[in-house]
Amino acid sequence: MKFFAVLALCVVGAIASPLSADEAAIVKSSWDQVKHNEVDILAAVFAAYPDIQAKFPQFAGKDLASIKDTAAFATHATRIVSFFTEVISLSGNQANLSAVYALVSKLGVDHKARGISAAQFGEFRTALVSYLQAHVSWGDNVAAAWNHALDNTYAVALKSLE
């Protein structure tokens, strides 16, 4: 039991300002508008930042147009988007903080092993937000909720890159 109390304190410290229920609802609602556009989301990231595409051995050095409609691309895009869907679905509930922390920490650890830099995490964020702005109902409240969510996510993931 003591372990879980310590873990909970670590999570709260790492995610000092978790999303409110209202912010989580805004993020979930906007994500629901695009979460089935997996291929388009990943293609937008690769188009904006070819250096990210170069980190994927199965896609490195290939023309985006030639890989976008392949099963391998769709499968990988679905993995990425499904990760976000899982984290978003857990957001807004204090009881889920340790689960969110574990998922996002693992994301950072896994990407550190692949040589992904903090700058590339930043590029991914920029491309994702640009995609969201163009494809969902976007206003100041949506921007604020997404920034809060991504700030929390990146604080944990980037700590794992250290």
Curated annotation (Swiss-Prot):
Domain Globin: from-to ranges: 18-162
UniProt keyword annotation of Acetylation present: no
Family recorded in the similarity comment: Belongs to the globin family.
Signal peptide boundaries: 1-16
Binding-site list for heme b: 76, 111
Any one GO MF annotation of this record: heme binding
UniProt-listed InterPro entries: Erythrocruorin (IPR002336), Globin (IPR000971), Globin-like_sf (IPR009050), Globin/Proto (IPR012292), Mb-like_M (IPR044399)
Provenance organism: Chironomus thummi thummi (Midge)
Residue spans crossing the bilayer: none
Lineage: Eukaryota, Metazoa, Ecdysozoa, Arthropoda, Hexapoda
Name this protein carries in UniProt: Globin CTT-VIIB-7
Subunit structure: Homodimer.
One Gene Ontology term, aspect cellular component: hemoglobin complex
Keyword Transmembrane helix recorded: no
Record key words, sorted: Heme, Iron, Metal-binding, Oxygen transport, Signal, Transport
Further information: There are at least 12 different components in Midge globin.
Superkingdom of origin: Eukaryota
